[in-house]
């Protein structure tokens, strides 16, 4: 496998992930409302119309499902470019990059950037500094992301092995 390619892929995918999250969030913080802690959502809904914000709603499942399909497609390209030679090497590359992005999302985007970036706060919750700095909430969400990430990575490694090995 080519580690230079893997590092370049990781950097490019982190940039793409950041853009995919940050652009809609800056334009309309409500877009990702299901990803905010519940106390922030409840404060927002005190002064705004209630919209579906639980994880198992059609809107949220559609957004997350599309993201998983895109991740699966990207995974196939990533492991092919990296030179994966069997199921396990494809899984290592794919899930390794998934974990890197997951941890970047938790430890940098959620804990540092979004916790301190006033422009992504929901209207009416700007005063809730402590709620936006809930590290445990984002860490638990990151753990769920690690588990969910196994699905496209295992499927992708299987498809890759079937197609290219």
Model-derived features with residue positions:
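Juxtamembrane "helix-exit" motif on the non-cytosolic side of transmembrane helices
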Residues: 78-84, 163
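Residue-level signature of transmembrane alpha-helical entry/exit and packing/kink sites
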Residues: 5-10, 89-94, 145
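Hydrophobic alpha-helical membrane-embedded segments
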Residues: 7-31, 97-114
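Cytosolic-side membrane-entry/anchor segment at the start of a transmembrane helix
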Residues: 24-67
